[in-house]
Design a protein with these regions (language model features):
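Membrane-interfacial loop-to-helix junctions in multi-pass transporters
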Residues: 26-42, 69-79, 148-155, 204-211, ...
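Hydrophobic alpha-helical transmembrane segments of multi-pass integral membrane proteins
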Residues: 2-11, 32-64, 85, 237-277, ...
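Transmembrane alpha-helix boundary signature
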Residues: 11-26, 52-55, 76, 191
Length: 333
């Protein structure tokens, strides 16, 4: 909830003082129109791999993606889908991602070994996705107008990206972004002190529905877990395994269901990891393989559920419905 509040305050403050427009102008002056979507996807992949958090990546890139969409005529939901897809790809492979840590610890394998197996599965899909985004962007010409690049207004986003890549806590990154955006806005005349406060208040208000949905979904799912519903389904999923392929399918189904119920892939991995380890040992599945399956399917499901933090965050920052973003995620997933 605190991350949602801070993200809303930062996004609106940065927008009010011109940081989003300045960053969009910078991106559009570097990349041709047909490569903008693919460029945002690659940036999201790189940032997420570097920082190990998909939510932090979405917070940093979603406003820029929406700004690019507005100037080029591409749907906002499409560009937000690009950001979410890249963020989940990087989260899946990052060495410092909590999902990678939990998956490898529960399966008893080394992170480097899991990465080698994981990337063989994920990289071809990422390449195809990047090519798909180039194809989607082929209809975007160079007829749009770009304003002058105001470097001082780009500074807050650069600081947010650099500090995130350096591994600084997401909340600290957002607080720094809010303060720096406010200072730049005051110096450049973007707003006065009351305008800064009003921007933060508006950003937090815009996140209100998102916060309520998150709290309600979390409470409902915890009630299901507390009453044994998740354990019962897991038992049913694992009771009829007959082959190695069936065991791998059960591991994938197990983590997918746990993620659907918890809307948190780390918690889902903690719950399903020990059971997946038992299945892998019984059917002699390589720990690197089982860890990769757990991490891949946890990130896959987390990235497409409309009540997950990633889609809710992207939807809140872009002022669209999570369902609108999902129709573009289907192209990737």
């Amino acid at each position: 909830v605190l991350i949602f509040i801070l993200a809303g305050a930062f996004a609106q403050t940065a927008k009010a003082m011109g940081a989003v427009d300045a960053t969009v102008n910078l991106a559009m002056s570097i990349l041709p129109g047909n490569l903008l979507a693919a460029g945002i996807f690659l940036a999201a992949c790189f940032i997420s791999i570097s920082v190990g958090t998909s939510v932090g990546t979405i917070v940093a890139l979603a406003p820029v993606a929406v700004g690019i969409a507005d100037k080029t005529g591409m749907p906002d939901a499409l560009m937000l889908g690009v950001v979410v897809s890249g963020a989940m790809f990087g989260d899946n492979l990052s060495f410092i991602s909590d999902t990678t840590i939990v998956a490898t610890r529960t399966q008893g394998c080394n992170m480097n070994d899991k990465f080698k197996v994981n990337i063989r599965i994920a990289l071809p899909i990422a390449i195809l996705t990047g090519l798909l985004y180039v194809l989607i962007g082929s209809g975007v010409g160079s007829g749009y107008e770009t304003g002058p690049i105001e470097w001082i207004k780009v500074l807050p986003y650069l600081v947010v990206l650099v500090t995130a890549i350096c591994g600084v806590n997401v909340m600290m990154v957002l607080i720094a972004g809010i303060i720096l955006s406010g200072i730049v806005g005051l110096l450049t005349g973007g707003f006065d002190i009351w305008g800064w406060n009003a921007s933060m208040g508006l950003g937090i208000t815009n996140m209100g529905e998102l916060i309520i949905v998150t709290l309600l979904a979390g409470g409902m799912l915890e009630m299901i877990r507390y009453n044994g519903g998740i354990d019962w389904i897991i038992l049913k999923l694992t009771s009829r395994i007959r082959s190695t392929k069936g065991a791998e399918g059960s591991i994938a189904a197990l983590i997918s269901f746990a993620n659907l119920c918890t809307a948190n892939n780390t918690i889902a991995l903690i719950m399903a990891g020990p059971i997946a380890k038992d299945i892998a040992d019984r059917f002699k599945i390589d720990p690197r393989r089982s860890a990769s399956l757990l991490d891949i399917f946890s990130c896959f499901v987390q990235g497409i559920i409309p009540y997950g933090a990633q889609l809710l965050m992207a939807a809140g920052l872009g002022h669209v419905s999570p369902i609108e973003i999902m129709q573009y995620l289907s192209l990737i997933h």
